[in-house]
Amino acid sequence: MSVKEQVIAILKEVKPTKNLENEKDIIENGLLDSFELMTLIANLCDTFGIEIDVDKMTPENFNSAEAITAMIESLK
C-alpha cells in the first residue's frame, strides 16, 4: 500500500461519515474537529513511525490527502 493509500485509509478511519479523499480544504472548511485532527496526527505518527513537530502542524500540511502525503514523505 502506498503512503497516499495509507493516508486515505487513516482519513476514512478518523472521519468515516465523510469522503475526504479528494477534498482540498479539509482544515479550512472545518471538516475535522480538533479531536479528529489530533487522532489523525496520532494515527499518522503510529503508522509511519514519524514525529510531526509543531511547526509542521499547519493547515497547508493537512488540507488534503496529497498535502499530508507530501509532509509524511518529507519526514521519512
PLM ranges: what are they?
Residues 34:
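Catalytic nucleophile serine of serine hydrolases
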